[in-house]
From Swiss-Prot:
Keywords: Ribonucleoprotein, Ribosomal protein, RNA-binding, rRNA-binding. The keyword RNA-binding applies. The gene is rpsO. Part of the 30S ribosomal subunit. Forms a bridge to the 50S subunit in the 70S ribosome, contacting the 23S rRNA. One of the primary rRNA binding proteins, it binds directly to 16S rRNA where it helps nucleate assembly of the platform of the 30S subunit by binding and bridging several RNA helices of the 16S rRNA. This is Small ribosomal subunit protein uS15. Belongs to the universal ribosomal protein uS15 family. PANTHER family: RIBOSOMAL PROTEIN S15, BACTERIAL AND ORGANELLAR, SMALL RIBOSOMAL SUBUNIT PROTEIN US15M. The keyword Ribosomal protein applies. Pfam families: Ribosomal_S15 (PF00312). GO terms for biological process: translation. CDD domains: Ribosomal_S15p_S13e (cd00353).
Amino acid sequence: MALLQQEKQQIIESYRLHDTDTGSAEVQVALLTSRINQLSQHLQRNPKDFNSRRGLLMMIGRRKRLLNYIAKHSPDRFRELAERLNIRVKK
């Protein structure tokens, strides 16, 4: 269920801000979005998996907090990130 190392490295390389960046808010949001998408597909196949549903809701909450941080500190980067990840945001 977790991301493969290659997938994770590919996401980090495409969303990092500089060469050694592996943990910026943008990278964390991109990794969480990938895991959220995988878990959503799992829950469509297994609708009674309530523990995974709770984990999904926790990931969505963490991603929301990170997005709020990015929006507060850098609105331009926030809009670009939301567009690249196809995340709906309130106006």
